[in-house]
């Protein structure tokens, strides 16, 4: 298992939906730090910000292979996009690490904003082929599949 958490765009350009994949030891926490539920945001509008605290371990308590609807926000709690998050906990993922996929709207501006937030919160940009490399190194696929 690799210690660094990586993030990268996992889908092609031009579609209405883009997928950003995050993999590694801290994938759940990195995404948890920028993901908010609709309920949380509506409570945030009703009460003082100091009274409501988001816990970045939100995904730690969730089952693997589950889908979560919500929003990606920046550090000022401004919504960047409405998203679907797919959670795949290790070892039952492509890389055999914790993997989170963010399904976001396809515009380049939004995708870059979300990717920058992930990098700001501890991920690093994945190198080309790095998700497949991790799958190979962790025994998920063999050399002929890589």
Protein language model regions, located:
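A glycine-rich (often HGG/GG-containing) alpha/beta subdomain
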Residues: 1-146
């Amino acid at each position: 298992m690799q210690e660094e958490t990586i993030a990268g765009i996992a889908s092609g350009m031009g579609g209405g939906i883009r997928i950003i994949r995050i993999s590694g030891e801290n994938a759940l926490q990195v995404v948890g730090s920028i993901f908010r539920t609709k309920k949380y945001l509506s409570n945030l509008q009703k009460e003082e910000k100091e009274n409501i605290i988001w816990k970045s371990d939100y995904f730690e308590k969730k089952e693997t292979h589950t889908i979560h609807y919500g929003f990606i926000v920046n550090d000022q709690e401004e919504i960047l996009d409405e998203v679907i998050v797919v959670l795949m906990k290790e070892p039952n993922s492509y890389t055999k690490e914790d993997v989170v996929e963010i399904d976001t709207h396809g515009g380049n501006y939004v995708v870059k904003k979300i990717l920058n937030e992930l990098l700001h919160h501890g991920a690093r940009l994945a190198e080309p082929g790095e998700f497949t490399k991790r799958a190979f190194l962790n025994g998920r696929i063999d050399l002929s599949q890589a």
